[in-house]
Amino acid sequence: MGNVKKQFILQDKKFRGFCIYRLLFGISYSVMIPIIPLFFKSIGMETITIGMVISLYGVSKTFMQIPFGIVSDKVGDKLTLKIALMLMALVPIGYIFSDTTFKAGSLYVIQGAILGMAAPATYSVLARTLNVKRRGECTGLASAVFTLGGGIGAAIASFILSKFNSFNMAFNIAALGIFLTLIYVVIRVDKVKVEKGKINNKASIGEVLYEIKNRGFVYKIIILSSSAVLGDYIYSCVVALIHFYGQDVLNVSTGYTSAIISVYLLVFGLAAPIAGWVSDKIGNRKQFLYSFLLMNFTLLGLIITRNITIFTVIIILYFLGATYLNASVQSCLSEFGAYPKIKGLVFGIVGASESLGYAVGPLVSSYIYEYNKNFLFLGLLIVSVLVTIIYLALFNKSKI
C-alpha cells in the first residue's frame, strides 16, 4: 500500500496544488469563454466582426507572452500569476457593463492579453513543481485537469443560458470563480526567491540569447514553437469551421459537429496523462515522430472520406495524435525550468507560437474554405506536413 501511495503522482503537495489551480481556473474561465460569441451576437455584433475580434484575441495573447516571460523571471512567477488573475477576475464584470459592440470587442482583446500575461508564469510554476523523473506524466495530467475544468465550466455556462437565458449570471459566476482561484494561488502556490539583476537590461537579454545559443537550444525551441503553432492552428480551424463543413460537405446536423468538439475535449482529457506516461517510457523523440505520422495520415483520411462513421473514427484518431504531440511539447518545454536565466523567454516564445496558431488558423482556413469547401482538411494537412519536415530536418540537432 505504501508503494502505491508513493507512486501516485498527486501525492506531491506542490504539484497537487498546481493541478487544483489549473482545475479551478479551467472551470471559472470556461464559464465565460464559450458564451462570448453568443454574447457578441446578442448585442448586435456581425459574424465577420466576431471572427476578427477572436483573431485579435489570439494576436494580443501572442504579443504579451514573450515580454511577460521575461517579467515572470524578473519579479517571480507567483506575483505575475497573481496580477494576471486579479485583472482577469475583472474582465467578466466588464462584459456586464459593455453596452456597445466596440466596448465588448475591445475587452475581449484585452482578455487575450491578460491570458498571455499568465501563460509563461503558469509554465514556470509547472516546471518547478513537477516530478522530473515523471515529467511527461505530470505535464499530461496538468493538461488533462485544465481540459476537465474547461468541460465542467462549459457545461455550467450551457445550463445557465438554457435555463435562465442570462449572460450576466454566467459572467458573475466566472468572475467569482477566478477571484477564488486567485485566493487559492495566494494561499497554496509556493513562492520562489527571485535572483535580482539577471534580466533587467538589454545586456542581460543578450546574455539570455547567448545562453540559448551556447547550450544548443535554438533548434529545440524551433521544433517546440512550430509544433505549438500546428496544434492550435488546426484546433482553432476545426472549432471555427467544423459546423459549416458538417453542413456543406458531410450533410450532418450541428448536433453532430458540436459533439465532435466535445469528443475532442473528452479525448484530450482522458488521453493526456497516458500520452505523458508513454513519452516518459519511449522518449519524446519517438513520440514526436509517431504523433506527426498519425496526424498526417488521419488528415489525409479526412480529406478523402465522406462516410460519417469513418469520418468520426478518423477524427478521433487525429485528436489522439494531437494529444500525444501536445504531451511531448509540454514535456520538452518543462525541461527548461532547470535553466532559470532562459526559462521565462522560452516559455514566452513557445506560448506565443501557440497563440499565433490560434489567431492565424481561422483566418487562413476561412479563405481556403471560401475558395473550395472540400479543401479545408487539405489546407490543414499542408501545414502539418511542413511542421513534420521541420522536425525531421532539425531533430538530430535539437537535443530532444
Task: Describe each model-derived feature in a short phrase.
Residues 109-146:
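Cytoplasmic helix-loop-helix junction between adjacent transmembrane helices
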Residues 117-130, 324-338:
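Intracellular juxtamembrane helix-capping segments at the cytosolic ends
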Residues 58-66, 150-151, 265-273, 355-359:
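Residue-level signature of mid-helix packing/kink "hotspots" within the transmembrane helices
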Residues 1-12, 192-224:
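Juxtamembrane intracellular "pre-TM" segments in multi-pass secondary transporters
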Residues 169-186, 377-392:
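Symmetry-related core transmembrane helices of the 12-TM Major Facilitator Superfamily/SLC fold
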Residues 35-48, 240-255:
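Short amphipathic helix-loop junctions that connect adjacent transmembrane helices
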Residues 66-76, 272-283:
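Helix-to-loop junctions at the C-terminal end of transmembrane segments
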Residues 79-93, 286-301:
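Structural signature of the two symmetry-related core transmembrane helices
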